């Protein structure tokens, strides 16, 4: 009886949709290598930074940090330099004008404002521009829920690291908001 109930739960697993072709598709119909993280995976991680969460949960990614804790963090996809990977947040391409190659560092994106991450590995330059030879990282931020909500979290870790997170969100017929502070 326990085995048959497990099979029933397999039918209840929601289908995750992704957007590698800039249109919504089922994960099973995508022809390229894709990793998708939901807010549950992101929130359960012990890391503060989204870059470390991506590195822990995705294959073919290399995280490199230029200095000690809190310094610039870049991600390489499929072994190519970071300049060959593009980062989008809610469909907007992220570029760092202070970077020598225009790439974007992920150290300042904290996990509490992220709803979903899609990592599209492989050549996607026809859809995401010439810098997407290694792949593209699509980050989708959280949206406000109906009503008004707030949340506090306190985290601590090794090397005397501490993190305090606050978020507030809400929505009604006219607007929707989400604010996250670290």
Language model features: what each stretch is:
Residues 13-45, 74:
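N-terminal periplasmic "start-of-domain" segments of outer-membrane beta-barrel proteins
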Residues 16, 50-57, 73-76, 85-88, ...:
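N-terminal periplasmic accessory domains that precede
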Residues 60-71, 93, 97-98, 129-133:
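Short, glycine-/polar-rich solvent-exposed loops and beta-turns at beta-strand/coil boundaries
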Residues 79, 168-172:
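Residue-level signature of outer-membrane beta-barrel architecture
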Residues 93-121:
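Short acidic/polar hinge/loop motifs at secondary-structure boundaries
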Residues 152-156, 179-181:
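Transmembrane beta-barrel strands of outer-membrane/channel proteins
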Residues 174-177:
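Repeated loop/turn-to-beta-strand initiation elements of outer-membrane beta-barrel proteins
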